[in-house]
């Protein structure tokens, strides 16, 4: 046991601790992984830590012109500073009335998760006001908020807001404080303008909505009834007629979940402008219905409905399937149909943005996620293609081959192709009737290259959100993907062309953005401020887009990371700026070649190798630790017995086991002593990570030092000090300077180990067994006893 304890102390002293992974290296392994504590230690992230009694945070609007971000949660509207979300946040407490909450509970809803005012819509009304809607405890309500820079509260109420109470609200609206005058620079809610939120905000907070406020008209994909069965795309407010999709028509919408809405112009003619909705729904055309399909739908902004048919209903609504699949060698595709999030990356041409979408697989047998990219050219080609039509003896879906009415269904009035028609009410009845029965396009929209950009299969998480940033590096422009997961982490990914057919995915980092893991709900990015803002049920976090110092202190580490944000400046890995005049900045994102980029700096790579000394006993085991900074590096172990010998590579044998953490040597032999070097190779760049000098001790020598014969040991003379511990005798026997470190560690170890009660100094001795006997109880005692 003492021999094993000596080996354990030596292993702890040199930092070696064996670990046995259960699986091989997985693809898409992050180069840097940071826990929430480690992320905070970098000073590049901040968590919104005001103690509000609320949950379900959603980032609903980013206003970079005013440096504000507007967040909705249960019973609160927050206005946060984009530079620092904890700096003077503006808070409005907007709760449902107690009577409404009581009615909600009586209807069978949960008092905490459903019977509250969950803010789900914040849209810019004009330069001074916001339009805000909440579920209102299953009674949707909307009003206007003055977007000021100061809170409508006295210092006392501001303190209460920080503690979680905020400004008092009555009957679902904020009561104005009499001490705070209503001025333009005050952030306050206008209760006198409270109105119904039906058709704007869902009743159920678990149902998502997608909305856009355009020209003071609100377009929203939403469920409009208490039971959550009537879904529609609505147009409310404004001067035009209120519009919606055809009610209870499964060909139009079939149990949809709305994800995103985006205005994308078709041409220079404003009458051609269309609003695109991204959603998923149960499909009627699937071979094995019901199945969930991802959809993209669109409507014309100047749609007024039909004259006799489709009155006050969209007469230009069309939809198509979004396909995100991995083609197999046998021609069978693996589909990801559950659309989760959409990010629209603007380009110099406002008519042709790039669409990024996150998908997950349906069902529980196959668990996976994917990111697909779509072009507007492909989307428009599908909407200009054939319509889906049911015909034939089997009543199956076919492309419509009959006579197409004029104007083509889905064309906007007064646009490029219909300049003489000023309204959809001027369309012939045959066009309106065709639209009612043929809203679906026959062809589907496929991603670029007809394959996903990023795929995750077999991972213990699913992707939930996406944000994309364009970064100018020394060798070109790159798109950096930030992917949120249902584990509360954010992954930073770039995808590079490997050859003509394949792409190479690099996960630069994965960080935990919340102290308590929770699925990422919403995420927005500010390229101007180089910040990412992430929201979940537990709070809001904003973090920098780059942490260059986390890649390492060497030029090779910085270059091998291939992060477009970072470059070697001659001293450290720091933020790359295209306008920098320093000639020593080294960056190579496309190839990551430190041999070419880091000339003059690579000599320091081997000097930074960790050197240590370990001891082992023949017949036992030893673990040599080696963890390269990059998980993509190839690790090799080299052995050199004596300084003049040639180094040879250690290959996997019965006695040698290579793990992700190092090298395990089993059944040590005296011939195993020597210098072990762990080298890491990545992109043809090789450097030494660690060197371990291993000393193998004979079992007989160790046993003789730890257990000397009794005849040789004489009783200590009077007045002598405490006897020398056996391990110290072993150190004196070996006469090696490194063994003094083991003695040092052992002394410190025994100093901190609490003594047992029997050996503790000053502890009362336990009584003898005869003293512990219970005395016999005599009934009659002498008086003087």
Swiss-Prot record:
Residues 1-18 form the signal peptide. It comes from the Eukaryota. GO terms for molecular function: chemorepellent activity; neuropilin binding; semaphorin receptor binding. Its main location: secreted. PANTHER family: SEMAPHORIN, SEMAPHORIN-3F. Expressed abundantly but differentially in a variety of neural and nonneural tissues. There is high expression in mammary gland, kidney, fetal brain, and lung and lower expression in heart and liver. This is Semaphorin-3F.
